């Protein structure tokens, strides 16, 4: 098929070419992420893997499902497609102008248009987009790391940048880069990581252009349509058909916002399934609590909830007939036509009013995954995993032996919920598929020792299938420093399903057994830790599934 073009071919895509295109898209997305991971500088991106790439077509539809990504909508809103040129790179991180795709300011997003020859005029035109965003070390704001737990406005969280053209026809905008690096406590890492993102996306754009040049614009775009249509049909037939028609309600809570005294911040989903409707699944967030004074808000009510639909849709895969089939299902734009989202009025956790702070918005969007799982478990008689809370940021900052400032942050996972067919997974990083930092690396770069990194014994909730275990990590500081934490589930545990018990909550203890022993809350900015003191972190265990008395005796 090499060199064969189908510019005026049939409207139905060649099924063989569809497989070629789908495989190429997945390979390009993986190449972009691999390039970013190998060429970036900061531990948060290079080692913890807190970044993502995505491929979108000219209609702004997400084509790939291996990874979640942001949206192209805000870029095209401010820079019409017709004004774009080969070599352009667009940049933004403004939470309130990102259409819901960017949740907090340290997530810096770059977008590169892909060009190919128009089949009629022969002129180069935009046919797709390569996009990547990563969690950068520091973008300014009140505290190192740009995630102040006591922020009461987004202005305290760092530099906000609306969509701008960062590269123009292959030439970087040095003035914009100077402004961003000047506002960062880690300017060298910021510059290097941004360059890694831009270079990787430009390389991905060249690879995708080659695909269009080889098979023709019309043929490849027909394959895009076929890929998304297949996803829509598979989710309608194999997944949504397992949800009985009816209306179901579930709610859960974030525990605190970092500013007010700990209290419950409600998140509610009313799910309605109507198998006869063109849009069969309705997710209504009415009843979600008012926006918080602290930074746990998430801007979800943009682009008709486009980002949230793709964010929540992976939970639906648990309804697949077998675990093997679940692993085969991707989440791309094909799920969007099947879901309607209804948002409450402005001024809630999901519809905050500018300039409400958002840096700890994981408390809300991660909890929504659990709320959707809970309401689906209710609807399907327990065909859902128990609850899990598998992301939290912890870290230390101070000065090293040379007097230079340092910042170490880590995304620590936890145990996933027990499932109807197996125990939960131990110490996983479901979102955003991140990793813990290697001990050898952190000890060689930062002034502390890792004295323990293992499983938190018995942290998973009991059940016929127990919840996964969390981390038990202990570090001993070699110099005075400050500890930071952005974590929830330190009071309320991950709940079980069908009689399964709750897992153990998150906890941080400084100087355990020592004269200054103290247990910290989940949201902490600058807890002083003296040289020689130990910080003990135990992350959440997942909830159990099923009655513990039904557990196999040899399990």
Regions found by a protein language model. Give the residues of each.
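Glycine/proline-enriched, intrinsically flexible loops and inter-domain linkers
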Residues: 2-86, 91-92, 96-121, 126-555
């Amino acid at each position: 098929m090499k060199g064969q073009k189908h510019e005026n071919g049939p409207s139905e895509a060649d099924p063989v070419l569809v497989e070629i295109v789908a495989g190429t898209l997945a390979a390009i997305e993986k190449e972009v992420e691999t390039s970013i991971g190998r060429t970036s500088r900061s531990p948060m991106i290079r080692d913890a893997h807190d970044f993502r790439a995505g491929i979108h077509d000219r209609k702004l539809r997400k084509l790939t499902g291996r990874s979640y990504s942001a949206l192209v909508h805000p870029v095209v809103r401010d820079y019409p497609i017709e004004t774009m040129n080969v070599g352009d790179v667009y940049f933004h991180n403004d939470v309130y102008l990102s259409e819901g795709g960017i949740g907090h300011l340290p997530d810096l997003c770059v977008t590169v248009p892909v060009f190919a020859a128009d089949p009629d005029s022969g002129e180069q035109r935009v046919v797709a987009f390569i996009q990547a965003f990563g969690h950068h070390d520091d973008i300014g704001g009140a505290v190192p790391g740009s995630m102040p737990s006591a922020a009461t406005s987004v202005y305290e969280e760092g530099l906000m940048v609306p969509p701008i053209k960062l590269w123009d026809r292959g030439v970087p905008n040095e003035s914009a880069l100077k402004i961003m690096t000047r506002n960062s406590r880690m300017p060298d890492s910021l510059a290097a990581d941004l360059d890694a993102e831009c270079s990787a996306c430009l390389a991905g754009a060249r690879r995708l252009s080659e695909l269009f040049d080889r098979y023709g614009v019309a043929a490849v775009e027909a394959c895009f349509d076929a890929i998304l249509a297949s996803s829509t049909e598979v989710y309608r037939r194999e997944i949504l058909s397992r949800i009985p028609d009816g209306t179901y309600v579930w709610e859960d809570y974030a525990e605190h916002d970092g500013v007010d005294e700990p209290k419950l911040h409600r998140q509610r989903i009313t799910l309605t399934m109507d198998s006869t409707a063109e849009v069969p699944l309705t997710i209504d967030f009415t009843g979600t609590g008012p926006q918080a004074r602290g930074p746990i808000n998430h801007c979800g009510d943009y682009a008709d909830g486009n980002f949230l639909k793709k964010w929540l849709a992976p939970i639906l895969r648990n309804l697949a007939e077998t675990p093997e089939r679940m692993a085969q299902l991707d989440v791309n734009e094909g799920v969007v036509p099947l879901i309607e989202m209804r948002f409450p009025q402005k001024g809630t956790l999901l519809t905050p009013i500018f300039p409400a702070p958002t840096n700890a918005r994981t408390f809300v969007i991660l909890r929504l995954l659990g709320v959707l799982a809970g309401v689906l478990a209710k609807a399907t008689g327990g065909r859902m995993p128990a609850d899990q809370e598998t992301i939290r940021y912890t870290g230390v900052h101070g000065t090293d032996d040379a007097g230079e400032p340092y910042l170490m942050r880590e995304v620590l996972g936890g145990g996933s919920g027990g499932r109807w067919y197996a125990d939960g997974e131990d110490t996983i990083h479901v979102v955003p598929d991140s990793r813990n930092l290697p001990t050898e690396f952190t000890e060689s770069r930062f002034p502390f020792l890792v004295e323990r990194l293992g499983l938190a014994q018995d942290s998973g909730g009991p059940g016929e299938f127990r919840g996964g275990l969390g981390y038990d990590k202990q570090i001993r500081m070699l110099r005075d420093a400050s500890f930071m934490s952005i974590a929830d589930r330190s009071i309320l545990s991950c709940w079980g399903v069908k009689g399964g018990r709750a897992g153990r909550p998150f906890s941080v203890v400084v100087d355990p057994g020592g004269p200054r022993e103290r247990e910290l809350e989940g949201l902490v900015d600058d807890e002083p830790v003296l040289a020689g003191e130990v910080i003990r972190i135990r992350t959440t265990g997942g909830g159990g599934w099923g009655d513990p008395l039904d557990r196999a005796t040899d399990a």
